[in-house]
Amino acid sequence: MALNSLSLSLQFGKFPDAALHRAALPRHSVARWIRHALQSDAEITVRIVGAEEGQALNRDYRAKDYATNVLTFDYTQAPYVTADLVLCAPVVAKEAQDNQKTLQAHYAHLLVHGTLHAQGYDHETGEEDAEEMEALEIEILAGLGFDNPYR
């Protein structure tokens, strides 16, 4: 299977334990995970942030005053995807621990999830859409060697 091309910018904000998160997110792995979820060529920025920045972005853009695991800002979709994915490191770490997943496996899931959002998939529009998106995530992650994230 030929993968779509990806122009990737990987950024890390300033937050506690940043080195741990950098170690879980080598650039080649991040690019691989995203490329497997792409249905078009893309330019994507991935930014890993602390709780304060994550909360501010969620509050300012979604009117939800708490830090969430991943935010997707999609600017264009097919035939060329342009998007920013913002992942909140402390939330991702807590969820990984609570669900007994490795940090890397949870990041892979959230990057696939965010990339699907950037292409127009939405799990909040109805049960059928949520099932379609989850099935795609499971299939993509299995192809990458990760377990079903919903178990």
Swiss-Prot record:
The keyword Zinc applies. Keywords: Cytoplasm, Endonuclease, Hydrolase, Metal-binding, Nuclease, Ribosome biogenesis, rRNA processing, Zinc. Single strand-specific metallo-endoribonuclease involved in late-stage 70S ribosome quality control and in maturation of the 3' terminus of the 16S rRNA. Zn(2+) binds at residues 113, 117, 123. One of its GO terms (biological process) is rRNA processing. The gene is ybeY. Binds 1 zinc ion. This is Endoribonuclease YbeY. Pfam families: YbeY. SUPFAM superfamilies: Metalloproteases ('zincins'), catalytic domain. Its EC number is 3.1.-.-. Disulfide bonds: none annotated. Belongs to the endoribonuclease YbeY family. It is found in: Cytoplasm. GO terms for cellular component: cytoplasm. Its main location: cytoplasm. GO terms for molecular function: metalloendopeptidase activity; RNA endonuclease activity; zinc ion binding. NCBIfam families: rRNA maturation RNase YbeY. The keyword rRNA processing applies. InterPro entries: MetalPrtase_cat_dom_sf_prd, YbeY, YbeY_CS. Its cofactor is Zn(2+).
